Structures are given as C-alpha cells and as structure tokens.
Amino acid sequence: MSGVGGGYPSDLTDEQWALVVPLFPPARVGPKGGRREKHPRWRIVDAIFYVVRTGCAWRQPPKDFAPWPTVYWYFTWWHDDGTVERIHDALRGKVREADGRDPEPSAGLIDSQSVRTADTVPAATRGFDAGKKVKGRKRFIVTDTLGLLLAVHVVAASIQDRDGAKRPLLWTRLDHPGVKKVWADQGFAGRLAEWTAKILGRDLETVRKDPDQRGFQVQHKRWAVERTFSWPTAHRRLARDYETSPAHSETMIRWAVIGVMVRRLTRGRAATRPGPRPLVRHVP
C-alpha cells in the first residue's frame, strides 16, 4: 500500500500481503543480523508490482515508494536466492488446493510465445522468429491443467520450439515428478517427443487440429496454457521484453503470476488497507 493518495491499483491489499509475507526471508534487524532494513518490505513489494503492472522504468517509480536502487536491489536479491520462485510455488499449491486439487499436478501443458524486445536488450539474447515474424525473445512455459505456471524459460526468438522446450521440460521433470504427461501443439512434435520419452521417461502428446477446423477455435486440453500467456502480457512491463537478462525476464513473469494468484485467493473478500504494516515478521 502506498503512503500517499490511498495507494495504487497494483498495490497488494492487507489480505493479499498476509498470504505472501510469511514466505519472505526474515528481515534483518541488526546489529548482529546485518544492517537493519530501512524500508518496510511491503513498500518494496508494492514498488515491484507497480513496475511490473505499469511498465515504468526502474528509475522512474513514484517518489512515495522506496528509492529505486533499493527496490531493484531487493528484486535482484529475491531473484538470486530463489525467494520469488518459492513464493510463486507456495501460492500455486494454495490455488490448486482451493480448487479441490492436489497441491502437486499430474499433467501439464507446454507452449511458446515470441515477443518483441526493447532496444536496450543485448543482441546476444534476442533473435528472429521466422515463423511469427518477430524479432526478440521467446518464452517457453509449462503449466498444469489449470494454467498455473510450473516452469518458464526465456531464450532468443530464433530458437526452435523443439530445442527450447527441453530445458523447461527437464525442470518440470525434476521439480514436479508427478507430472507424467505433457500436452503440446504440433510445433513440438517429432524428435522432442522421442527425447522426452527416452531421457525424461515422460509422455509428450501432440494435440492436433481438427482437419475440418476453420478459423480460430479453442483446442481441447490446450486452452489453459494459451490463457496463461495472457496473464503476463496484461502487465505492461511484459507486453514486450525490457530485461537485460533472460533470467530476470523469467522472474518478471513469476511476479506477474504471483499477482494473479493472490487476487484469485482473496477473491470475494473485502479489501482493507488499515495502515502501516510491520517491518519485521515474527519467526517462531
């Protein structure tokens, strides 16, 4: 919650903040635990969500947030130590349980999306997707059947689907051993399915279009992953890729999906913003 003007639409409500605050590492309180943190965590998190949602540059958030170098330092720290991924994965389990599912999925879907990049993106990390006529980067995602993210991998757009899919499929195999089958479109057919079966011991099934199909139709079993791509691209920072590092692009996507999940988990509850939140959470 912003301290000025009642907050911004991208700010977390207190109910949403209560879901994520236990998942952050304990705040440093000094003197032996490191330098005491000057800015409340919720101001840092709200500033990150503001950047993700509005697409503003790191150096240009409103002045009522923490200074931008501080916000960016936390963004990088939480990326490097795995905090963002842990928060994302914990919330995904809660969303699945709220939907009456087991926290761990048994099936998945994979797809890719090519997006344009800003001029500041290094040439070595972008390329040209000849099929989609896009110069930029390609996002590979694996989701569960609800469309919740299991793995994300960002590469140059010139990488073929059959090559770029191997790493997210491997991550899914390692992090979610219960996933036995993954559905994909025809762009992933061929030797990738053979590799998945031989190396990962999993079934990659291609969902083919009906030969009588005319125009756009939602494909059975694949609509969820296609919808998932709309979640990050609704955030202006992700409408194109601005990040110097592909790994930071992956983290930006996770932040966007975290925002989607906390809103889903608090849907129907009255949103309240009663005042300052504590800097330090109590750790048993």
Feature-to-residue mapping (PLM):
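Short alpha-helical elements
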Residues: M1-P284
